[in-house]
């Protein structure tokens, strides 16, 4: 090779290597940008996730406080002597003033004696025993 050609050849090799270096540097820069963008997106996703969790916990805490306040109000009403939501009816003679007064008293009176209750219980026991006697014996005898 001639010296001019050789120098031209060297120059072309140098520029090619420079171009390759420039290309590789540019690809590295682009890759860095892409990685940085991906990392930023990932960080944004993580931040939004933690913000969501934080808002959920705050809402849950507020709801618990509201329920505690409401139950405290109900407890104060029932324990404080105020009237609660339960109404116990109390009848007065005036409530029945428009009813007919010429009615006869009922023929049967309910007594508070336990004799009748014991008789009923005895009759029930007897009927149960009869039913047991009529039933099949499923116990195996050896």
Swiss-Prot record:
Comp. bias intervals (Basic and acidic residues): 111-121
So which domain of life are we looking at? Eukaryota
Q: Does the keyword DNA-binding apply?
A: no
Q: Where along the sequence do coiled-coil regions lie?
A: 110-141
Instruction: Give UniProt keywords alphabetically.
Output: Coiled coil, Nucleus
Region (Disordered) residue ranges read: 63-86, 108-142
Chain positions covered by the region annotation Involved in NPR1/NIM1 interaction: 47-53
Q: Where in the cell does this protein reside?
A: Nucleus
Q: Report the Pfam families cross-referenced here.
A: NPR1_interact (PF15699)
What are the recorded Gene Ontology BP terms?
defense response to bacterium; negative regulation of DNA-templated transcription; regulation of systemic acquired resistance
This protein's GO CC annotations: nucleus
Q: Where is this motif: Nuclear localization signal?
A: 60-64
What turns on this gene?
A: By salicylic acid (SA) and BTH.
Main localisation, per the record?
Answer: nucleus
Q: Does the keyword NAD apply?
A: no
Question: Could you give the subunit structure recorded for this chain?
Answer: Interacts with NPR1 C-terminal region.
Family, per the entry? Belongs to the NPR1-interactor family.
Protein name stated in the entry? Protein NIM1-INTERACTING 1
Source organism of this protein record: Arabidopsis thaliana (Mouse-ear cress)
């Amino acid at each position: 090779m001639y010296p001019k050609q050789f120098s031209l050849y060297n120059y072309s090799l140098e520029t090619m290597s420079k171009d390759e270096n420039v290309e590789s540097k540019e690809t590295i820069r682009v890759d860095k940008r892409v990685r940085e963008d991906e990392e930023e997106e990932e960080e944004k996703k993580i931040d939004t996730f933690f913000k969501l969790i934080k808002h959920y916990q705050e809402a849950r805490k507020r709801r618990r406080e509201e329920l505690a306040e409401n139950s405290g109000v109900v407890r104060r009403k029932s324990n404080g002597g105020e009237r609660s939501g339960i109404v116990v009816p109390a009848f007065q003679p005036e409530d029945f003033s428009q009813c007919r007064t010429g009615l006869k008293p009922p023929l049967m009176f309910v007594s508070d004696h336990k004799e009748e209750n014991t008789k009923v219980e005895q009759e029930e026991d007897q009927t149960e025993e009869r039913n047991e006697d009529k039933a099949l014996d499923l116990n195996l005898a050896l």
